[in-house]
């Protein structure tokens, strides 16, 4: 420490007195040291004084700085309340509420007269009215806005009773239509609805009868619907077999049965005659069946026939003189020959199982019915 103070003394001889202090620093050393500090350091040095000064206990005659501070509750409310009459005028805020504008009857008449001609005046018209009746232009604009809103409210109230009247009238009309004693509003539509309701059961009953009678027709007992359709399509026309006139109209009756106004009794009578004819033909004794090439060729088979199993059919001359003459008029019966045994084996058009089979199937009831019908005709 002594060496350091000696160096300072050599560097700054003017700042040290000839009698050094016990700490090794003279009194003037503090002044240039404090002056060489930065401004922030000087401020901190000034704000933080010595502890001895802070912990100084006040005397009896001195007052503590804490006692000089008054609490908030001790402040006079008259000094803090700006609404007090004794408060300063600069502290009282200005009122933001706009004063109400009162119109005289003459001013209202002029505004109402102008409103009848123009409901939406522009800025020029409003300024002209303001100069004429001595009212600010902004007040005139507000008056026109309120007047238009009043017109809209009046229009809405005027339309509500009319709509309510239409609603009640429509409801009463619907109630009158529900009761049979009151006349219907549209008699033609009511009659059409009644007629449709009466025709619908008749149409359904005729359709049911048609399907029931259709089920009695002789078609093969097969689980496949395609074979039934092919059998019905392969049937020749009634004129080729000289059937009675009643049976020739069966196809027309089937078409006419779709008409709901067709007589049900006539349809039942035609079907009854047809069924009697078919049953009578099926009861006759069986004869040798002639071969018809067209009938045999109409059936398409999906089975492969072995080479040793085949049938032969001779060619039959067809008469072209008249379409009404039977195809079997001048033809002699022909016997079918087979290479194996004497049993005639016919392959069904479509297999029930759906798998191709090369073995022929035995004759069925369907083949016997076809043979009996063709022989008797």
Swiss-Prot record:
Entry-linked InterPro entries: HD, Homeobox_CS, Homeobox_regulator, Homeodomain-like_sf
Principal location listed in the UniProt entry: nucleus
Induction: By activin and TGF-beta1 (immediate early response gene).
Residue numbers spanned by region Disordered: 41-93, 334-369
GO BP: positive regulation of DNA-templated transcription; regulation of transcription by RNA polymerase II
Localization, UniProt: Nucleus
Compositionally biased residues, Basic and acidic residues: 70-82
Polar residues bias (residue ranges): 336-362
Record keywords, A-Z: Developmental protein, DNA-binding, Homeobox, Nucleus
GO molecular function terms noted in the UniProt entry: DNA-binding transcription factor activity, RNA polymerase II-specific; RNA polymerase II cis-regulatory region sequence-specific DNA binding; RNA polymerase II-specific DNA-binding transcription factor binding; sequence-specific DNA binding
Tissue expression remark: Expressed mostly in the presumptive endodermal cells of Xenopus embryos.
GO terms under cellular component: nucleus
Residue ranges of the annotated DNA-binding region, renumbered to this chain: 96-155
Entry similarity comment: Belongs to the paired homeobox family.
Function, in words: Transcription factor which plays a regulatory role in the development of the embryo. Involved in the establishment of dorsal/ventral pattern in the early mesoderm. Activates the head organizer gene cer1 by acting synergistically with otx2 and siamois through the 5'-TAATCT-3' element of the cer1 promoter. Also binds as a complex with lhx1/lim1 and siamois to the 3x 5'-TAAT-3' element of the cer1 promoter.
Official protein name in the record: Homeobox protein Mix.1
Species of origin: Xenopus laevis (African clawed frog)
Gene giving rise to this polypeptide: mix-a
């Amino acid at each position: 420490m002594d060496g350091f103070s000696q160096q300072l003394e050599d560097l700054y001889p003017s700042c040290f007195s000839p009698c050094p202090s016990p700490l090794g620093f003279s009194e003037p050393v503090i002044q240039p040291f404090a002056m060489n500090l930065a401004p922030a350091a000087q401020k901190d040095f000034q704000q933080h004084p010595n502890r001895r000064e802070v912990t100084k206990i006040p005397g009896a005659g001195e007052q503590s700085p804490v006692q000089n501070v008054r609490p908030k509750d001790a402040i006079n409310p008259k000094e803090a309340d700006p609404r007090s009459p004794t408060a300063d005028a600069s502290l009282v805020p200005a009122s933001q509420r706009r004063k109400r504008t009162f119109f005289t009857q003459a001013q209202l008449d002029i505004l109402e007269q102008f409103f009848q001609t123009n409901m939406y005046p522009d800025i020029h018209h409003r300024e002209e009215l303001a100069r004429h009746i001595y009212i600010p232009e902004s007040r005139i604009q507000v008056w026109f806005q309120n007047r238009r809103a009043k017109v809209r409210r009046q229009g809405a109230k005027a339309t509500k009773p009319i709509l309510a009247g239409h609603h009640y009238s429509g409801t009463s009309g619907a109630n009158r239509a529900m009761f049979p004693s009151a006349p219907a509003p549209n008699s033609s539509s009511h009659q059409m609805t009644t007629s449709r309701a009466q025709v619908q059961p008749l149409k359904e009953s005729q359709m049911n009868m048609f399907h029931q009678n259709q089920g009695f027709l002789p078609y093969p007992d097969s689980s496949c619907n395609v074979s039934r359709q092919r059998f019905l399509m392969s049937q020749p026309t009634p004129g080729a077999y000289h059937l009675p006139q009643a049976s020739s109209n069966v196809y027309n009756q089937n078409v006419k049965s779709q008409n709901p106004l067709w007589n049900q009794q006539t349809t039942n009578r035609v079907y009854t005659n047809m069924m009697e004819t078919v049953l009578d033909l099926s009861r006759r004794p069986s004869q040798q069946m002639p071969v018809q090439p067209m009938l045999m060729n109409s059936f398409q088979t999906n089975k492969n026939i072995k080479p040793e199993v085949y049938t032969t059919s001779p060619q039959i001359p067809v008469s072209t003189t008249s379409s009404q003459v039977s195809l079997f008029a001048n033809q002699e019966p022909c016997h079918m020959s087979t290479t194996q045994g004497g049993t005639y084996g016919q392959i069904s058009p479509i297999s029930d199982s759906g798998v191709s089979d090369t073995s022929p199937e035995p004759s069925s009831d369907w083949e016997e019915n076809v043979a009996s019908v063709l022989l008797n005709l």
